From Swiss-Prot:
Protein name as it appears in the record: Actin-2
EC number annotated for this UniProt entry: 3.6.4.-
Note, other: There are 8 actin genes in A.thaliana.
InterPro entries in the record: Actin, Actin/actin-like_CS, Actin_CS, ATPase_NBD
Record family assignment: Belongs to the actin family.
């Protein structure tokens, strides 16, 4: 890849909820849009209107009233490759406005993903988009890079899936990675449910987006859940108003902290899983006894679902209760954690030492999609 020096690599973080894309070396993604493909529910009757058979991202969101919205990524795994291809096409041509055959591309994926997933990604990049080179990196590892560390445990929680990934000197420890299929989308669904108990009805895919906005603007994590519940019964200090698109104003109280509490008590949504604090602890306990101290001192939060205020204090409190009493515990919540996977990718792809890591088109032509397991780890 002699000619790679003058061409900026593309970094594309394909999340379950949002695609973050941009150029390596930038400090933030240029394009952030929903990972959604919408298809018309009705046939077009207006002659001369150029109706498309599919809309991607923000355009799909704005026309959501007449479309069926589908997310091609579920729980971090691509479930619909045709739609995924549309999203990538949209990213390259409409959002970044580049020719994919001219730029190396760094993609991200969730840990513990099926092997076929990254093979298919590789195949599409080289065969459909003619990329000159590509690489697939693990999301949580990139978040750690972005925080300036090489050792630590990352709790990465997005829209579709949460993970705890212990990393030592830059290597993730696969035997200790734990995955929790509980994330932002489940919190939105739970908030829809508990708002219904208050008498507000939210049912359609379009209304779900409104509830997601309520969640993002008003929710917080209680440091002491029981105590907050008691307070909210007697006082209205916690209540906030939210104006719906049609002008109606709704009031939301204890729901503000009941919603993210699911992360710590998954039984609220009928899941028999451990909460994020316990999953983090279990993940640390699966690691070698000598490195646990370094992990306890570097617990890094990443992803949009860790954006709730109060989450770092609560994490710290819960893990302190589980860990040995003399252990020093530090939970780091970087302010840019919503995009830290992308930022880590931007850092990685612009390192001079990384340039020999790319899988080139020539290597792919020789070895096939399986090469991705040999070169990306």
């Amino acid at each position: 890849m002699a000619e790679a020096d003058d061409i900026q690599p593309i970094v594309c973080d394909n999340g379950t909820g949002m695609v973050k894309a941009g150029f390596a070396g930038d400090d933030a993604p240029r394009a952030v849009f929903p990972s959604v493909v919408g298809r018309p529910r009705h046939h077009g009757v207006m002659v001369g209107m150029n109706q498309k058979d599919a809309y991607v991202g923000d355009e799909a969101q704005s026309k959501r009233g007449i479309l069926t919205l589908k997310y091609p990524i579920e729980h971090g795994v691509v479930s619909n490759w045709d739609d995924m291809e549309k999203i990538w096409h949209h990213t390259f041509y409409n959002e970044l406005r580049i020719a994919p055959e001219e730029h190396p591309v760094l993609l991200t994926e969730a840990p513990l993903n099926p092997k076929a997933n990254r093979e298919k990604m590789t195949q599409i990049m080289f065969e459909t988009f003619n990329s000159p080179a590509m690489y697939v990196a693990i999301q949580a590892v990139l978040s750690l890079y972005a925080s300036g560390r090489t050792t630590g445990i990352v709790l990465d929680s997005g829209d579709g899936v949460s993970h705890t990934v212990p990393i030592y000197e830059g290597f993730s420890l696969p035997h200790a990675i734990l995955r929790l299929d509980l994330a932002g989308r489940d919190l939105t669904d739970y908030l829809m449910k508990i708002l219904t108990e208050r008498g507000y009805m939210f049912t359609t895919t379009a209304e779900r987006e409104i509830v997601r906005d309520i969640k993002e603007k008003l929710s917080f994590v209680a440091v002491d859940y029981e105590q907050e519940m008691e307070t909210s019964k007697t006082s209205s200090s916690i209540e906030k108003n939210y104006e719906l698109p049609d002008g109606q104003v709704i009031t939301i109280g204890a729901e503000r902290f009941r919603c993210p509490e699911v992360l710590f008590q998954p039984s609220f949504v009928g899941m028999e899983a451990a909460g994020i604090h316990e999953t983090t602890y279990n993940s640390i306990m699966k690691c070698d006894v000598d490195i646990r101290k370094d992990l306890y001192g570097n617990i890094v939060l990443s992803g949009g679902t860790t954006m709730f205020s109060g989450i770092a204090d609560r994490m710290s409190k819960e893990i302190t209760a589980l860990a040995p009493s003399s252990m020093k515990i530090k939970v780091v919540a970087p302010p840019e954690r919503k995009y830290s996977v992308w930022i880590g990718g931007s850092i990685l792809a612009s390192l001079s030492t990384f340039q020999q890591m790319w899988i080139s088109k020539a290597e792919y032509d020789e070895a096939g999609p399986g090469i991705v397991h040999r070169k990306c780890f």
